[in-house]
Every structure is written in structure tokens, then in C-alpha cells.
Design a protein with these regions (language model features):
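N-terminal leader/targeting and accessory segments in enzymes
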Residues: 1-100, 104, 281, 308
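Adenine nucleotide phosphate-binding catalytic loops in nucleotide-utilizing enzymes
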Residues: 3, 10, 15-17, 198-205, ...
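Residues in the short beta-alpha loop(s) of Rossmann-like NAD(P)-binding domains
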Residues: 18, 41-43, 146, 227, ...
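Hydrophobic residues within alpha-helices
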Residues: 24, 125-129, 295
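Phosphate-binding loop of NTP-binding sites
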Residues: 30, 68-70, 79-225, 229-238, ...
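Short beta-strand "acidic-cap" motif of Rossmann-like dinucleotide-binding folds
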Residues: 34-39, 141-142, 165, 243
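Active-site-proximal loop->helix
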Residues: 47-52, 113, 152-157, 321-323
Length: 331
């Protein structure tokens, strides 16, 4: 993981006392970094965070942003803070670097990172990729925009981490500077959250493209070839490209063929599973499975381990889940 900052030598301001901001401040404080947290809302809005900050003696303020926040070398921003917030515009005017909580977590990870973004499918893909990595016996951290915030997970997860699997939102990517996943996945891109991007779909696409901006020819980028926006977006990538399709057979990446899911991560075409043996149904889930399996294979996990984890995967809670076939229907 390349690091743009020697964080230990810096004074850092964290904006926002919600879960990711609080976690970032706590992690930095535990690592010996001089940190200050500032929150616009009053302490009554975040009683648990206020108590934790006081108990752990982390300097902080609630109810507004004082000039103290600019007495630092670096600003860490929560994903809920829009890029055009006055405090961030002022930081930009002062020439202060601003990074995301995701990037803070990555500074304390040495192993490979699988990062997943996309409008739809990223939670299922992230969850399955994490399950596969765990099944391989690797010490696997799963977090980001799913479950625990990345820095929160690092507070409780035993170190060292062998491999990290992250769900990353466009909001988190907006302020990434040196974030460098060894394997990145873009599931889909369709219009979403455009109010955050001044109504511009192109700005939203550009945010998703940031997941691969620091990748090089030794890294991997998995993407949906069935989504024209994604297919066009990855043309600027420097990483090795691995397309995935459920509509056509491919020469590398992942695809459906004769009732099977197939992957080729550079080891030749490998049969992953029969579609009928999956516990998750639908073309969208076939795409998610192919992407997660391909990412794991690219990170060196044996195909038999991947296959077994895929067959056992029942999907994500509150998502579409197969129950039974009855009276000619699927429920």
C-alpha cells in the first residue's frame, strides 16, 4: 500500500462524529497521532460519541467548527460531509489536503485490498468475497460501507490482516488520494445520488473511476462488460482488465456458459459451479458471484475453496433469496 502521507508525524483534524468519523479519530489516537475531531451538530445529537471522545481523552468540539480545525496538517472527512461544505472549501482555499476515512484505514494495512464499488450489487459481491477469503484460512477483514466502518473494524480486528475486503461508496471515493486496492471491482453504474454531484451523472461516474486511479499494471480491475457505462469508464485504467458478463462468452474474466459459471484469472478457463446448484438466483447474482470468485482467484485462493464457499453462500440478509420451488414456481 503506497502512502501519500507519513501520518504519524502529522496533526490531523477529523470532520464528523458519526460512526466513520468517530472510528477514524479513535484509530488515529490509538496509533499515537495528534488528532482533533470537530462536529457541526451539538453533543446531544451524538451522546455516545461524545462520551467515547471524553473517556478516551480525544480533543474534540461539538456545535460548530472553530478555527482550531485548521491548525492541522491534514483533514479526514466522513462520507456524509458533502465536498462543497464550507469547511472543506475553506480547507481547499488554505491548501490543506483532505482525505477519506477509508484512506486512513488503508494506511494501517500492508496486505492486499479487494475494493468493491458500484450502484448495485456491491454489498453482495463484497460479502461473498469476504466469505471466500475467510474460507481460505486467511485473516480477513471485511468492512467499509458494509457492517463496520473500515477504521472501526481495525479497532477490533486481530492484526496483522492477511487480506481486506471493502465495500466503497462514491462518497468515500470522492476524497481518496492514494487509496490503492490490489483488486478493484466495479459492479454497475447507473444514475444515483446525483443531488450530491450537482445533478451531473458524469461527476458520479468520475467518482467511481477513482477506485482504480492509483492502480498500475500489476493490479486487477474487474468490471461488468454488460453495463455500457462501466465498460466505457474503465478505458482509462492502467490495471489488468478482467471483464465479467452473463450475456456472452469471454476469453478471460468471468461468464456463463452452458448452464455453468466460468472464470479465467490467467490459469485457463475454470468451471466454477453449475448455475442450478447456486443458492442465490437471478442474472444479477450470477454477476455478483462471478466477480467475487474472480477477485478471490486473482488474489491466489484455490478454485476448490472458492467453489465450496460459493455453493454455501445464501446471499445477504434482506436481499432476494431463494426459498423453495413449489407448484411450478420459484419462491
Amino acid at each position: 500500500m503506497q502512502r501519500a502521507f507519513n501520518i504519524a508525524s502529522l496533526k490531523v483534524t477529523v470532520i464528523g462524529a458519526a460512526r466513520s468519523g468517530l472510528a477514524a479519530a479513535r484509530l488515529l489516537h490509538q496509533k499515537g497521532v495528534t488528532v482533533f475531531l470537530t462536529e457541526l451538530s451539538p453533543a446531544e445529537s451524538y451522546p455516545e460519541a461524545a462520551a467515547i471522545l471524553a473517556n478516551e481523552r480525544i480533543p474534540h468540539e461539538f456545535g460548530g467548527h472553530s478555527d482550531r480545525m485548521y491548525e492541522s496538517d491534514l483533514i479526514v472527512v466522513s462520507p456524509g460531509v458533502p465536498s462543497d461544505a464550507p469547511v472543506l472549501l475553506e480547507a481547499e482555499r488554505r491548501g490543506m489536503p483532505v482525505i477519506s476515512e477509508i484512506e486512513v484505514g488503508a494506511m494501517f494495512i500492508d496486505g492486499p485490498i479487494i475494493a468493491v464499488t458500484g450502484t448495485n450489487g456491491k454489498t453482495t459481491t463484497t460479502t461473498l468475497a469476504g466469505e471466500i477469503c475467510k474460507a481460505s484460512g486467511r485473516n480477513t477483514l471485511v468492512g467499509g460501507n458494509i457492517g463496520l466502518a473500515f477504521t472501526d473494524a481495525l479497532l477490533v480486528h486481530p492484526l496483522p490482516v492477511d487480506i481486506t475486503v471493502l465495500e466503497v461508496s462514491s462518497f468515500q471515493l470522492d476524497t481518496c488520494v492514494s487509496f490503492h486496492p490490489s483488486t478493484a471491482i466495479i459492479t454497475t453504474i447507473t444514475p444515483d445520488h446525483l443531488n450530491r454531484y450537482h445533478g451531473s451523472f458524469q461527476e458520479y461516474v468520475a467518482s467511481k473511476q477513482r477506485i482504480f486511479m492509483n492502480q498500475n499494471a500489476q493490479d486487477n480491475l474487474i468490471y461488468s462488460q454488460d453495463n455500457p457505462v462501466v465498460e466505457h469508464a474503465v478505458k482509462t485504467a492502467r490495471a489488468r482488465l478482467f471483464p465479467v458478463s452473463v450475456q456472452q462468452r469471454l476469453s478471460r474474466g468471468g461468464w456463463r456458459e452452458n448452464g455453468h459459471l466460468m472464470i479465467d484469472a490467467g490459469f485457463g478457463g475454470e468451471v466454477l459451479v453449475r448455475v442450478e446448484d447456486l443458492q442465490v438466483r437471478g442474472a444479477h447474482n450470477h454477476m455478483n458471484v462471478l466477480m467475487a470468485a474472480l477477485a478471490a482467484r486473482l488474489e491466489g485462493i484455490p478454485i476448490d475453496v472458492i467453489r465450496q464457499a460459493v455453493l454455501e453462500f445464501r446471499g445477504v440478509e434482506h436481499r432476494l433469496e431463494f426459498v423453495i420451488e413449489l407448484d411450478g414456481g420459484t419462491w
